[in-house]
């Protein structure tokens, strides 16, 4: 009797499961057919492009920055400048854009909303409300005091304020050199870039470069917990919150102290203080809200500094691999400033605008950014439409576009000999010139990075004050994992907010005899 009573239920269950499977198959077939005739890697009705992407990820070395697999796929299957990755139902399907005119259309002509793949990526370091505010079209316009701190003029004016931090960096490099030991340079570079941002915005130093710094480990511990892995974030959620709360308390105290110092008139008014005054005067925020907002702003500067530090590590890696470029850059430093280190520091203090004449050094930085691509930008799309630009029509069959900076920077028709480190292509008057909208490491349009001038200046200043005094020689373990040579070989990029040389870029630091 029991068996008979279960019969109808079993039949209903089987019919339901069969119906759901049939609906899933119908939906899958309908979805896969959207990509028929479109440029994609090997595509099948069962997996779409999931198999291709998974194979690339599994073939990558440990810690590899998986967004760069997109460029591997483009090369391997000879994809055009706009192609599609059908990743449904595991991941959102993506329209990969490596075409400048299409990228311009999406970001400047008809700007689309930025896609937030993981709203919790920087949580709880940044609140969801603050991230949403940052993504608004008028965010930069509503923060003129903060943006004023990111201009070339402000950076030049504040150069002398950076001297204590720069001397601390030199002292640390000397200590590492004298120790004769390998050292992962990533952490030191992160500290330097954060210091620059802190000095520019706060008017004072975080003192991160001192070996006894109390704040440096607090920041590093918070940053180490950032990442895409949801399992790790869940398992470590309590530890992540503890570290973030600790950093938050320190930054709240720092911002409050900066505001109080500005109110007292004890020192020149910093951009953070001016932003606070502006927000109170406009009525947009009360005192507590303004402090919280400015603390979140400092956290954004810290996160952006990590990405910039990754570019710094690759500058040293490429200059080591291309000694002729290193020699030419050092000669420019001698010519624009002085072969004498002491005179260089004096000129830097008296005439900081000379930094603007370091054209080849800036070209080294830009060529580095072209080669590593930084990452890319995700944009939301409306499906079942067409994107038309300059006579070309691109079907929109997925919800997300990925503007892939790396793929754009590695196109031979845009950048001749694209895998070679050739800073001369970025010199004024270079022939051929850089094609319009093809070099966009900080993106363009309303959502472009407001700190790009500060990032470029901080990297040029770093190379000026270290490259003639020290040789940083990458030292990877024998038999270390390697990626494709065009991605740095054993110095392949790993993910840490942005691309960094893997393993923290272990180096031997040598003090140059003729420095």
From Swiss-Prot:
Its main location: membrane. GO terms for biological process: mycotoxin biosynthetic process. Pfam families: p450. One of its GO terms (molecular function) is oxidoreductase activity, acting on paired donors, with incorporation or reduction of molecular oxygen. Keywords: Heme, Iron, Membrane, Metal-binding, Monooxygenase, Oxidoreductase, Transmembrane, Transmembrane helix. It is a multi-pass membrane protein. Cytochrome P450 monooxygenase; part of the gene cluster that mediates the biosynthesis of the indole diterpenes penitrems. The geranylgeranyl diphosphate (GGPP) synthase ptmG catalyzes the first step in penitrem biosynthesis via conversion of farnesyl pyrophosphate and isopentyl pyrophosphate into geranylgeranyl pyrophosphate (GGPP). Condensation of indole-3-glycerol phosphate with GGPP by the prenyl transferase ptmC then forms 3-geranylgeranylindole (3-GGI). This is Cytochrome P450 monooxygenase ptmJ. It comes from Penicillium ochrochloron.
């Amino acid at each position: 009797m029991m068996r008979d009573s279960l019969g109808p239920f079993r039949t209903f269950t089987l019919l339901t499961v069969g119906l759901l499977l049939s609906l899933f198959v119908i939906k899958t077939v309908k979805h896969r057919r959207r990509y028929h005739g479109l440029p994609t890697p090997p595509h099948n009705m069962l997996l779409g492009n999931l198999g291709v992407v998974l194979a690339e990820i599994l073939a990558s070395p440990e810690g590899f920055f998986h967004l760069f697999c997109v460029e591997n796929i483009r090369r391997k299957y000879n994809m055009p400048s706009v192609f599609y990755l059908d990743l449904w139902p595991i991941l959102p399907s993506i329209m990969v854009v490596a075409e400048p005119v299409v990228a311009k259309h999406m970001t400047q002509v008809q700007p689309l909303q930025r896609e937030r793949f993981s709203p919790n990526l920087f949580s709880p370091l940044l609140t969801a409300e603050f991230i949403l505010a940052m993504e608004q079209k008028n965010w930069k316009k509503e923060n003129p005091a903060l943006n004023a701190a990111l201009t070339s003029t402000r950076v030049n004016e504040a150069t002398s304020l950076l001297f204590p931090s720069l001397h601390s960096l030199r002292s640390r490099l000397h200590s590492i050199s004298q120790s004769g030991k390998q050292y992962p340079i990533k952490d030191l570079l992160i500290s330097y870039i954060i210091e620059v941002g802190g000095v520019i915005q706060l008017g004072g130093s975080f003192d991160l470069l001192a070996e006894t710094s109390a704040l440096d480990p607090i920041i590093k511990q918070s940053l180490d917990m950032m990442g895409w892995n949801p399992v790790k974030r869940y398992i470590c959620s309590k530890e992540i919150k503890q570290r973030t709360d600790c950093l938050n308390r320190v930054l709240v105290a720092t911002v409050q102290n900066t505001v109080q110092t500005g109110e007292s008139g004890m020192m020149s008014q910093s951009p953070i203080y001016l932003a606070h005054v502006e927000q109170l005067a406009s009525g947009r925020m009360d005192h507590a809200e303004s402090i919280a907002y400015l603390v979140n702003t400092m956290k954004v500067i810290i996160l952006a500094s990590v990405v910039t530090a990754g570019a710094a590590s690759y500058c040293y890696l490429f200059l080591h691999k291309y000694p002729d470029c290193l020699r030419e850059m050092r000669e420019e430093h001698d010519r624009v400033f002085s072969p004498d280190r002491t005179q260089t520091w004096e000129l830097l203090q008296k005439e900081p605008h000379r930094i603007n004449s370091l054209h080849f050094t800036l070209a080294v930085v830009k060529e580095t950014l072209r080669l590593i691509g930084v990452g890319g930008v995700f944009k939301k799309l409306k499906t079942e439409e067409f994107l038309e630009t300059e006579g070309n029509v691109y079907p929109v069959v997925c919800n997300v576009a990925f503007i892939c900076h790396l793929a754009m920077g590695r196109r031979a028709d845009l950048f001749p000999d694209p895998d070679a480190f050739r800073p001369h292509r970025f010199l004024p008057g270079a022939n051929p010139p850089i094609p319009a909208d093809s070099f966009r490491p900080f993106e363009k349009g309303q959502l472009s990075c407001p700190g790009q001038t500060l990032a470029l200046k901080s990297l040029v200043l770093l190379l000026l004050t270290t490259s003639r005094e020290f040789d940083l020689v990458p030292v990877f373990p024998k038999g270390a994992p390697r990626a494709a040579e065009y991605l740095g070989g054993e110095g392949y990029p790993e993910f840490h907010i942005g691309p960094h040389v893997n393993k923290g870029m272990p180096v031997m630091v040598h003090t140059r005899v003729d420095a």
